[in-house]
């Protein structure tokens, strides 16, 4: 992952590193764009999954070579910093990955209220 540039993924690696990283999957061709993804600082986030540390769905920090921490995951989904999640680490990642971004839900709610007030 250290060789994947910000905003990049496994196909941005040299051919030798692609083969090493992807192993047998390398020869299947096509797809698999979710593997070895590094977030970008300048673009919207990739879709957050419920299992960020699995090879098929991993999301790497844009600068550091590590998975995103729970609080970073929550910030991407616009949860307030003081929001408390309950459960195991896996359960918390699942809650955040399954969530609709807070700011998006709020905007949809306000739009619905405006629409209903016109009826």
Feature map (PLM): residue ranges:
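C-terminal target-recognition/interaction regions appended to catalytic cores
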Residues: 1-119
């Amino acid at each position: 992952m250290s060789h994947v540039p910000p905003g990049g993924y496994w196909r941005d690696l040299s051919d030798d590193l692609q083969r090493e990283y992807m192993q047998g999957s390398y020869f299947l061709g096509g797809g698999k764009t979710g593997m070895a993804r590094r977030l970008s600082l300048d673009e919207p986030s990739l879709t957050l999954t419920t299992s960020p540390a699995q090879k098929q769905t991993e999301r790497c920090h844009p600068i550091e070579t590590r998975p995103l921490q729970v609080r970073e995951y929550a910030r991407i989904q616009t949860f307030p910093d003081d929001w408390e999640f309950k459960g195991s680490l896996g359960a918390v990642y699942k809650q955040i990955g399954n969530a609709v971004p807070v700011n998006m839900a709020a905007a949809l709610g306000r739009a619905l209220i405006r629409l209903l007030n016109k009826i």
